[in-house]
Amino acid sequence: MANYLNRPSIFEIATAFEDGKNGEIKQKTKTNVVVNTTRIGYGKKSTVSKFIAMAYDETGNKVDSIKGYFLEPETDYNRAKVKNSDTSIAQGHYKVIPKTKLEERINTERRKRGETDIQLTYQWYVDSVPGRSGIAIHTGNYGKDTEGCFLPGENYSYDKETETYNVWESKKKAKELFDFFDNYGHNGIKINVDSE
């Protein structure tokens, strides 16, 4: 239907809004998330990094951000691209995808081979990591809780006796990060992994 008054149609208005928290109306926007993580501590069995997750609108303006820490296994760049190496992943730029998209892709391939579908355990995955698969973002406090995965935390500590890093309040920070992804990751989520 032509809109001679140069105003949005009822359909455009209806689809441009969604229910917000507590019944208020908020406008839908096409936002994306970029997570910049910098490794700052290398222990015998764990690596800690600081991160900032930033949400951007479609014009590139930052609309929100959160900070925290990630725990990964020990860093060994010689093994970072080796399957099942139980080390932190190689530095680089990766996509973060919800499990539903990864499950769909994996199960499509499995069905082609006549295999049964699988159900992934975690909510968010780091995608297309060279030589690696199943790199998730999930809760945990210790290096033994991760096999290449990213464990978010509110803060961290270093144990001099065992020469390992740990993160704390992981469930709280994971919920905050996952809510951030859900709220702002409509146009994609990227993670940039670097070191100081």
Regions found by a protein language model. Give the residues of each.
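Cell wall/extracellular polymer interaction/catalysis modules
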Residues: 2-166, 172-187, 194-196
